[in-house]
Amino acid sequence: MLFRSLSTDLKDAVLTALKGKIDGGGAAGSVKIYTGTKPAGPAVAITSQVLLGTLVLSYPCGAVADGALTFSPITQDSSADATGTATWARIFDSAGVAKIDVDASVVGGPGFMQMNTTSVIINGPILINSCVITA
């Protein structure tokens, strides 16, 4: 996010609003992981990016503190839909409405979403180790 000069309490307010939108459907949201270039935003349609798999968020999805939304454990996808390199993910509410796109990387990499591996094999598991969105 681009809110680097905001106070921590204001960052927390922005992220609490995001968390509220993800949890707003009254049930668990989801994360869809894709290959390719991340679109300009969650309202932009998927084009050539390949859907690798879908994972289910916890409900509520996480907690906000100190300018970060830290997601609770995310249920793995036990059978990937396709083979490819995970580069980004789109997070949805329980009604399937896209809320935010985030970069993916291996643990220790620069992505908000950290995976044990970004190399996904069809029918293999997809695991998100952590997802922390900072403002």
Task: Tell me the role of every PLM-derived stretch.
Residues F3-T87, D93-A135:
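Small cysteine-rich, disulfide-bonded extracellular modules of the LU/uPAR three-finger superfamily
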